[in-house]
């Protein structure tokens, strides 16, 4: 079985598959992805494969510069997005936005 290239929490799987979630915000450990990369996607909880995505763009962002567009692309409110990012990456301010589409 091929390993997954990137994982998402299971709660985001349906939003990814239906196109409601089109970005992911990651820390420096996942800043190496670039436009054109094709990635196998798995669930964080069990590493089970659920789709393949293509990276369509990347950019940097800070917790303070997250905006409504980021929130819409994550399919959540801006307050919820900031809370989720702060929970996943405590004490970090610099992040990497990965834009993607399901293949």
UniProtKB/Swiss-Prot annotation:
<dbReference type="InterPro" id="IPR007374">
    <property type="entry name" value="ASCH_domain"/>
</dbReference>
<feature type="active site" description="Proton acceptor">
    <location>
        <position position="21"/>
    </location>
</feature>
<feature type="active site" description="Proton donor">
    <location>
        <position position="74"/>
    </location>
</feature>
<dbReference type="GO" id="GO:0005829">
    <property type="term" value="C:cytosol"/>
</dbReference>
<dbReference type="GO" id="GO:0106251">
    <property type="term" value="F:N4-acetylcytidine amidohydrolase activity"/>
</dbReference>
<protein>
    <recommendedName>
        <fullName>N(4)-acetylcytidine amidohydrolase</fullName>
        <ecNumber>3.5.1.135</ecNumber>
    </recommendedName>
</protein>
<keyword id="KW-0378">Hydrolase</keyword>
<comment type="similarity">
    <text>Belongs to the N(4)-acetylcytidine amidohydrolase family.</text>
</comment>
<feature type="active site" description="Nucleophile">
    <location>
        <position position="24"/>
    </location>
</feature>
<dbReference type="GO" id="GO:0016813">
    <property type="term" value="F:hydrolase activity, acting on carbon-nitrogen (but not peptide) bonds, in linear amidines"/>
</dbReference>
<dbReference type="InterPro" id="IPR008314">
    <property type="entry name" value="AC4CH"/>
</dbReference>
<comment type="function">
    <text>Catalyzes the hydrolysis of N(4)-acetylcytidine (ac4C).</text>
</comment>
<dbReference type="InterPro" id="IPR015947">
    <property type="entry name" value="PUA-like_sf"/>
</dbReference>
<dbReference type="Pfam" id="PF04266">
    <property type="entry name" value="ASCH"/>
</dbReference>
<feature type="domain" description="ASCH">
    <location>
        <begin position="6"/>
        <end position="100"/>
    </location>
</feature>
């Amino acid at each position: 079985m091929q390993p997954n290239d990137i994982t998402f929490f299971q709660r985001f799987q349906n939003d990814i598959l239906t196109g409601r979630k089109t970005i992911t915000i990651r820390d420096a450990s996942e800043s190496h992805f670039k436009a054109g990369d094709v990635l196998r996607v798995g669930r964080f909880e069990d590493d089970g494969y659920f789709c393949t995505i293509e990276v369509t763009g990347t950019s940097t962002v800070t917790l303070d510069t997250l905006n409504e567009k980021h929130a819409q692309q994550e399919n959540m409110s801006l307050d919820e997005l900031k809370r989720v990012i702060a929970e996943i990456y405590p004490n970090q301010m610099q992040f990497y936005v990965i834009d993607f589409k399901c293949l």
